[in-house]
Curated annotation (Swiss-Prot):
Disulfide bridges in this chain: none
Gene source species: Mus musculus
One Gene Ontology biological process: immunoglobulin mediated immune response
Pfam families documented for this protein: V-set
Gene3D superfamilies assigned to the protein according to its UniProt record, in alphabetical order: Immunoglobulins
Molecular function, one GO term: antigen binding
Highest taxon above the source species: Eukaryota
Identification of the protein by name: Ig heavy chain V region 36-65
Alphabetical UniProt keywords: Adaptive immunity, Hybridoma, Immunity, Immunoglobulin
GO cellular component terms, A-Z: extracellular region; immunoglobulin complex
Domain Ig-like residue range list: 1-111
Note: From analysis of the sizes of several other differentiated genes that hybridize to this one, the authors conclude that all of these V regions have rearranged to the same J segment, JH2.
């Protein structure tokens, strides 16, 4: 199982960015994909989830309006778009596969992270 994320991004404040997470080694539509934010010196912050099988999405309220999650089943790729970027969006963003086991969800495989730098 591998989750390969797109490369680092340097973008202007106020613009948008779309990053990708390409899955391999398993059936893409059988597991959820989550996105997680980590700012320097801070903990992990869950952004949202997408079910690649049916396109169902669930977002952290904090990121509603900021983030759109999509998938392309034909290429086994998940995407996250962030809009109206500010310096607060500068962070490393991870995708992570979720698995349901024993009544709970766990993140069992992670991408390597995409570094986003927003410049003014």
């Amino acid at each position: 199982v591998q989750l390969q994320q797109s490369g680092a991004e340097l973008v202007r404040a106020g613009s948008s960015v779309k990053m990708s997470c390409k899955a391999s080694g398993y059936t893409f539509t059988s597991y959820g994909i989550n996105w997680v934010k980590q700012r320097p010196g801070q903990g992990l912050e869950w952004i949202g989830y997408i079910n690649p099988g049916n396109g169902y999405t669930k977002y952290n309220e904090k990121f509603k309006g900021k983030t759109t999650l999509t998938v392309d089943k034909s290429s086994s790729t998940a995407y996250m778009q962030l809009r109206s970027l500010t310096s607060e969006d500068s962070a490393v963003y991870f995708c992570a596969r979720s698995v349901y086991y024993g009544g709970s969800y766990y993140f069992d495989y992670w991408g390597q992270g995409t570094t986003l730098t927003v410049s003014s």
